[in-house]
């Protein structure tokens, strides 16, 4: 985004902080171990997405020189991962049903619906009634408050696999209260910025599932830390999406192949977002995508498209 509407980070600022602060901070480090990047950049507050981009580039370069796939380095146990899709808020319920029908026809194994005040119970009911026993979850993007707990409890009627980030990112106590009231598992997204945040949320009972977005948490190494912590506590995780090109999609597939990623993620096919991707397109096959096996992230951008 060109404006900080989703989070405090946005594209022009990320580009600027990389050029002016983060890259120069690493320039004098010599041959840098990718596992030291986060520590070197830690004095600079925030900017996790920019830090993730830089760490991933260094990790990719290091793994390529050693002919090691990212999936192997992270500890992947699968050669393909199940794929879900996120469906935004549509003008009408018929339009929503048409969109869901199309994605199911494409082969996606899980449907996620965005919800907000005035667009929650009825669209969820319509999808459940129309499509029956599909794997269905909802994402509120922090649209609700503690005053809405009783309203959100009505979602229990629809046998959802999870309710994602219903309350504000910093309201772990509110999420814990909601989790005690409803049967639908609470999944945290924006609340989790590190393994430490995940540990606090689990200790408070604020969630039963965690969505891991590498950009949000500062990179794939921190993502693995969160995965390992959640797995140790019996908390399932899944890989969220942030409109990645094929570069980020390849790395996300490597991450999603770890053993604790037991729920389908938002790893949609390239064609959903790009007429022409920066890499060879990722395609859905039988509801799954293949994890790249080449060194590093396993793909390379088309140089002509980078001009």
Regions found by a protein language model. Name each.
Residues 1-9, 84-89, 241:
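Glycine-rich phosphate/pyrophosphate-binding beta-alpha loops
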Residues 1-65:
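Metal- or metallocofactor-binding catalytic centers and their adjacent structured scaffolds
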Residues 19-23, 55, 59-60, 125-128, ...:
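Predominant activation on well-ordered alpha-helical scaffold segments within soluble catalytic domains
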Residues 71-182:
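Metal-dependent enolase-superfamily TIM-barrel catalytic cores that perform enediolate-based chemistry
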Residues 297-307:
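Extended hydrophobic packing segments that form well-structured cores
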């Amino acid at each position: 985004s060109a404006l900080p509407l989703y989070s405090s980070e946005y594209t022009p600022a990320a580009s600027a902080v990389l050029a002016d602060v983060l890259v120069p901070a690493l320039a004098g480090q010599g041959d840098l171990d990718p596992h030291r990047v986060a520590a070197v950049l830690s004095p600079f507050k925030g900017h996790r997405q920019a830090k993730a981009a830089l760490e991933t580039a260094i990790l990719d370069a290091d793994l390529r020189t050693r002919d090691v796939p990212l999936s192997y380095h992270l500890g992947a146990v699968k050669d393909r991962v199940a794929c879900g899709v996120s469906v935004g808020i549509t003008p009408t319920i018929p339009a929503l049903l048409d969109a869901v029908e199309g994605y199911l026809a494409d082969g996606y194994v899980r449907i996620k619906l965005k919800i907000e005040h005035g667009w929650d119970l009825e669209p969820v009911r319509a999808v459940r009634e129309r499509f029956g026993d599909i794997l269905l979850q909802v994402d509120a993007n922090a649209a609700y408050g503690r005053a809405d707990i009783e309203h959100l409890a009505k979602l229990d009627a629809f046998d959802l696999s999870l309710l994602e980030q219903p309350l504000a990112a910093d309201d772990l106590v509110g999420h814990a209260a909601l989790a005690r009231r409803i049967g639908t598992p609470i999944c945290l997204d924006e609340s989790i910025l590190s393994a430490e945040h995940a540990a606090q949320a689990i200790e408070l009972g604020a969630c039963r599932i965690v969505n891991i977005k590498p950009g949000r948490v500062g990179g794939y190494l921190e993502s693995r830390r969160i995965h390992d912590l959640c797995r140790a506590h019996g908390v399932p995780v899944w890989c969220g999406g942030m409109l990645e090109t094929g570069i980020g999609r390849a790395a996300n597939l490597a991450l999603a192949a770890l053993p604790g990623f037991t729920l389908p993620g938002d790893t949609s096919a390239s064609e959903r977002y790009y007429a022409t991707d920066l890499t060879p397109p990722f395609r859905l096959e039988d509801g799954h995508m293949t994890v790249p096996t080449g060194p590093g992230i396993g793909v390379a951008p088309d140089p002509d498209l980078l001009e």
